[in-house]
Amino acid sequence: MQLKKLGVWAGTDALSAADAAAFAKRLEGWGYGALWISEAVGREVFSACAWLLANTSTLIVASGIANIYARDSFAAAAAQKGLNEQSGDRFLLGLGVSHIPLVQGVRKHEYGKPVATMRTYLEGKSAATYKAVAPESPPQTVLAALGPKMLELAAELTDGAHPYNVSPEHTHEARAILGPNKLLCVEQGAVQIGRAHV
């Protein structure tokens, strides 16, 4: 999987399935490399990604992010491998610990210490048994990592990081922690871009 320099992060829950597929096809036609979609209280992110992958041919579809409290690590590993095998290695798994109000308030889970909880999750995902047809290439994972400890974990156990809503200074610091060979998929909000189609 080779990411292009520009992708789009968008919530698609307000769109019908047909409109979300049409949106993904438009992005693909415009030359964007990836579509990142979120997971909160709408569609389950892996089923949403499967739909978008099935309706595109070159676009990378990424979970930005899949909440680790929404499923166990074995389920995440199976989904990641299955989606990559089915799509020709076009699925990028973004994982995150989410936020206390969503985890405890909405999902009714106990929110653990973020770095320790994520480490345990990643180790479980790595050890997960998978007996279906494997994807051609090893699937890639990035972490929703903002602080230095989560960025260090991303560098140690994953392919990189997906920081959300951060400054250029943070991006520079994240690159220093991750090193030159890890993915750094930064979400930057566009204030004015001067284009009518986005």
Question: Where are the regions a protein language model picked out?
Answer:
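Active-site-adjacent structural elements that line small-molecule/cofactor binding pockets in enzymes
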Residues: M1-H197
